[in-house]
Amino acid sequence: MAELKFKTKAQNLKNLQTKLKKAKVLPLVLTSLEELISNEDKVLQDIQTLKANRLIIRSSSLSEDSMKNSNAGAFLSLANIKADSKDELLKALYEVANSMPSKSDEILVQPMLENITLCGVGFSVDKDNFSPYFCLQYDENGSNSSITDGSSKSAKTYYHYRNYLEFKDIRLQKIIELIKELEVLYDCHFLDVEFAFAIQDDKEELFCLQVRPLVMHEKNNLFHSLPKEALYRFYKRFESLKESRSRVLGDKAIFGVMPDWNPAEIIGLRPKRLAFSLYKEIITDNIWAYQRDNYGYRDLRSHPLIHSFLGIPYVDVRLSFNSFIPKKLDENIAQKLVNFYLDKLNKNHELHDKIEFNIVYSCYDFNSSKKLEELLNHGFNENEIKRLEFSLLELTNKIINPRSGFYLKDIQKAYKLKERYDGIINSNFSLIDKIYWLIEECKRYGTLPFAGVARAAFVAMQLLNSLVEIDFITKEEKDDFLNSLNTVSKNLSKQTNHLNFHNKDQFLKDFGHLRAGTYNILSPRYDEDFELYFDADQKDSKVYLQDKAFVFSKEKTRALNALLKEHGLEINACEFFDFLKQAIEGRELVKFEFTRLLSKAIVYIEELGKYYDIEKEDLAHLDIKSILNLYSSLYSINPKEQFIEEINRNKKEYELTQAIKLPSLLCNADEIFSFYNHSIIPNFITQKSITAFTAKENDKDLEGKIVLIYAADPGYDYLFTKNIAGLITCYGGANSHMAIRASELGMPAVIGVGEENFEKYLKAKKINIECESEQIFCL
């Protein structure tokens, strides 16, 4: 039985004054507008009994803090009111009173808490799905409101699994013990608690500033969906993965959701089983390592890049770092290098989506000598650095070779995809056989070459960027070159720019296979839901495209030839620009072509579901291997029964995936149970500023608005045809598709702001993006 029942904010605190053991409650006076009007002097006398210099006057309405509606922040609260100024005090009392709907609504008066050392808000569960974590957000800047009003610049967010009893910070332990005590007093596991630590009489004390129930209306309740046994199994698995595997160097295991093949961006943080298994099948289980090996890096075949940790996709970062080491580099230097990378990332978590730019040396460029100097401060001698530099140069020359560069063969392979595609879809194969061969051909002629061309394109961008770094070309010249390229996405933008009912069929023939979520069966193709993506009646879009040839002067060409020779790059200026163009355009071309096969395979999976009377929403939970196995294995059990049994099991597992909370970068096993959410540094595109209303991707009216989308997925390219003002993505790195496209189009965008910031921006009606100063303001 509960000792206390939830009432108003003021009544809750009043009742807690004599009950609460784990924290203090400040003295308080309750009044109302009715009482103020009838007996103003008595109210003022009562307030003087608080013996405070400054006061905080807060609303305490019956329509606040209930089980059905929190109305958080709906009514007025005024802080730092002088207790000895009658006029100021009365003015504040009436202002707070008049902000509430009823004359009988309470006004809560308390002393201002001084000498605050830590202040924040704690939830006893996740506020959105009630998963079993204590979620604390706090600030140590001395403010009593920086967390609640969103003004904090140094807020910390801490998650702690409810059944985990170990703590590293005594203050966080005390806050959680306070929340647990409140749970017992109110017999309620779903609480929102405001707290503060402050120095009183030379001692730091914990204060409970407010408690209210979390509103549960129409929310998914995952409170019982995460058994501790699952987390302890995960803990043991992580511990075992610390041991280095065959051919893998490095002393520390780190896993992340955004490095390298960036699953958070491509399939999301909590993908359903079909999307996750497709990504693993066609790229991250085997294909990725084959191409790194082919392109001159360490042979890591048979090592899967991505692990599923209770349904969340994590890249093995140590393995990834190994895969960027030239295979001819001395083993001892390679070992030191991997450990240097791991240590740098461990100390700079914000770089986890920028490892190829800010951590690893994966190719030679015009600024390599200067960049490699940092290794002198980390235990490398000049001889080791020179050997690394030479290895990178040798590898880069192999990649960019205009006659034998692997990327040229890979681009040619992609041209076979159309023939393979037509052969399969026009065959008399069963649905299962068609799915099998689409996936197989997608791997052989699609994702295998794509992994290679994507690597070549990265090398191309690194070389191009380094020309800017050494002031050989300007940033504007770099942008002019990129804008001169004839990419698939540029062609898509041109086509949609003039899209109408007359050319709609041809447009869908060319681009209809694209979908916003490339691997997601629940994301419709362009040709399945045209109206969702496009408006055939739209006027020509003001797309930021400038079609002009890039011209390099003869003098500049001669200088580039000399520069290439000076750096030992075995290519001339014309061949150099041909490489940049072919690699960057080729990356988009190969991806565009392989997604045609993948997208059709997903269509056939949907048809297979219809045949077996299984809904698309359920098919999203089916592992692709369960379908592929049926190509060469016949079982006594009917495939429908087999699928449904697995779907039900995976659905249950997915509840656990939704409930679990993990850091974006997992460096230590104990972070499985408790961790801080580290700050994320977003990627600002262009130097422009823009102020506009916000819109979500599915809103009908996007013109002139800043659009917010979760992933920087290429399928969202259609947004650029909607005359949008700007773009913000939750996930995505500096090298993501949308970052590149926004840069090409000169559109202000912020890529990869992180979950916490993204949720804040979703609530803003209007946003100001200042790309030059790298700031975002909610207006």
From Swiss-Prot:
Entries under InterPro entries matching the protein: ATP_grasp_subdomain_1, PEP-util_enz_mobile_dom, PEP_Utilizing_Enz, Phosphohistidine_dom_sf
Keyword field: Capsule biogenesis/degradation, Kinase, Transferase
Active site: 737 (nucleophile)
SUPFAM superfamilies noted in UniProt: Glutathione synthetase ATP-binding domain-like, Phosphohistidine domain
Record GO terms (molecular function): ATP binding; kinase activity; phosphotransferase activity, nitrogenous group as acceptor
Its EC number(s): 2.7.3.13
Entry domain remark: Contains an N-terminal ATP-grasp domain, a specialized central substrate-binding domain for L-glutamine and a C-terminal phospho-histidine domain.
Protein role: Involved in the biosynthesis of the O-methyl phosphoramidate (MeOPN) group found on the capsular polysaccharide (CPS) of C.jejuni. Catalyzes the ATP-dependent phosphorylation of the amide nitrogen of L-glutamine to form L-glutamine phosphate, the first committed step in MeOPN biosynthesis. Also catalyzes the phosphorylation of D-glutamine, gamma-L-glutamyl hydroxamate, gamma-L-glutamyl-hydrazide and beta-L-aspartyl hydroxamate. Does not phosphorylate L-glutamate or L-asparagine. Does not act on L-glutamine derivatives with removed alpha-amino or alpha-carboxy groups.
Note: The reaction mechanism comprises three steps. First, a histidine residue of the enzyme attacks ATP at the beta-phosphoryl group to form AMP and a pyrophosphorylated enzyme intermediate. Next, the pyrophosphorylated enzyme intermediate is hydrolyzed to generate inorganic phosphate and a phosphorylated enzyme intermediate. Finally, the phosphorylated enzyme intermediate transfers the phosphate to the amide nitrogen of the acceptor substrate L-glutamine.
Protein name as it appears in the record: L-glutamine kinase
